[in-house]
Amino acid sequence: RLNDLFKFSKKHKIKLASIEDLISYRLKYEKLISKIDTKTFFLNSGKFFLHNYRNKLENNVNYAITKGKFNVKNSIVVRVLSTRIKRDILKNIKILKSLKSLNKYKNFLLLIINRKDNAETSNINTLRYYGIGAQIIKDLKVKNMILISRSKKKIIGLEGFGLKIKKQIIVK
């Protein structure tokens, strides 16, 4: 298929671009999120920051909970949860369990994508949520990630956002 595209582009003098090129271009000129604010809060396990981001496509709020200092040179532990938030996020069992398991790391980012659709049945919006999550992660100055997930992930296009998964840790 790719060979056919090369032939077609050469014949019609059309330039080809990769998915990463397209994502990089759109990220440079089109932001899908805007930061609302950052709040500090304390739990028994220490000081955390809650970053609130508006998703411009769905007009809802997504959250990032961070602990520690981030440095572009270092790899940051990142866990992404995709759920429907109906009340205070710090009363959500899934979020509290994730915070408890992440607390063993000095620096981490827990990204909470607040989905409007049913996470179990909708694959249509998955790429859009990846883009929104990637923009939030990039806004928080993370470049290199140690991704914590329930299964091995092969996420195409993150390079277009300037993000790299250096390592994956599978949890149950």
Q: What are these regions, as identified by a protein language model?
A:
Residues 1-172:
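Catalytic domains of riboflavin
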